[in-house]
């Protein structure tokens, strides 16, 4: 399913036709350039690689510079791949804009969540902790993390202190409230992961079909 790359600008409130206030996230989406086209015959699957955001050549590695020069395209800072059922409708250098979506569509949004640094188990995993009085030294500790004799190891996935946040997070079935093609803006109902200016990947909802079929070859 095709999508677009964008940048989170923040949240605001808009009003619908009946005067109801709706909290929306504003994303500057695109324009994105098709950097590569993959197909079943050559690559074993159908996909396109989109590039977003200008970048100076001195900030890129040599393999990246070679890729852009081979395609005769301007360097892009962010590259993301989008799987498709059929990639034959796309060509290298083609530009995709936010108008591939329309108000009322449902989308999936992926981005890095806000990093919270090192956190304990109570903040990171919502543990209850221990007693807070009567001479307790347990307080905010994790408690037992396994058994001595069996399995004699810590199970994979056990909640432990560590780096909280800064993970790829996807929220599904968010509704598009408004599109402003002249400003490359898309307004999404509710909140999305990540900090302001964070890079966002937007795709058609995988689990919910849109009422009207969009033309993805604009």
From Swiss-Prot:
GO MF annotations, alphabetized: rRNA binding; structural constituent of ribosome
GO cellular component: cytosolic large ribosomal subunit
Record's keyword annotation contains rRNA-binding: yes
Swiss-Prot/TrEMBL GO biological process terms: translation
InterPro entries assigned to the protein according to its UniProt record, in alphabetical order: Ribosomal_uL3, Ribosomal_uL3_bac/org-type, Ribosomal_uL3_CS, Transl_B-barrel_sf
UniProt xrefs under Gene3D superfamilies: 3.30.160.810, Translation factors
Presence of keyword Ribonucleoprotein: yes
Subunit architecture: Part of the 50S ribosomal subunit. Forms a cluster with proteins L14 and L19.
Function: One of the primary rRNA binding proteins, it binds directly near the 3'-end of the 23S rRNA, where it nucleates assembly of the 50S subunit.
Protein family: Belongs to the universal ribosomal protein uL3 family.
UniProt name for this protein: Large ribosomal subunit protein uL3
């Amino acid at each position: 399913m095709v999508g677009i790359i964008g940048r989170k600008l923040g949240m605001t409130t808009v009003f619908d036709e009946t005067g109801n206030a709706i909290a929306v996230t504003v994303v500057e989406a695109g324009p994105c350039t098709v950097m590569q086209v993959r197909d079943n015959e050559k690559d074993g699957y159908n996909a396109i690689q989109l590039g977003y955001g200008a970048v100076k050549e001195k900030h890129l590695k040599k393999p990246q510079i070679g890729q852009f020069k081979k395609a005769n395209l301007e360097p892009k800072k962010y590259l993301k791949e989008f799987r498709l059922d059929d990639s034959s409708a796309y060509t290298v250098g083609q530009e995709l804009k936010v108008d591939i979506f329309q108000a009322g569509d449902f989308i999936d949004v992926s981005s890095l969540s806000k990093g919270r640094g090192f956190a304990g188990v109570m903040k990171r995993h919502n543990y209850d902790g221990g007693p807070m009085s009567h001479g307790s030294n347990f307080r905010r500790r994790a408690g037992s993390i396994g058994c001595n004799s069996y399995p004699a190891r810590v199970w994979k996935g056990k909640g432990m202190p560590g780096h909280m946040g800064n993970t790829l997070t996807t929220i599904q079935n968010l509704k598009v409230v408004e599109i402003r093609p002249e400003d490359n803006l898309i307004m999404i109902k509710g909140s999305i992961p990540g900090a302001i200016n964070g890079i966002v990947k937007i795709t058609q909802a995988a689990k919910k079909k849109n009422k009207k079929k969009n033309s993805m070859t604009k």
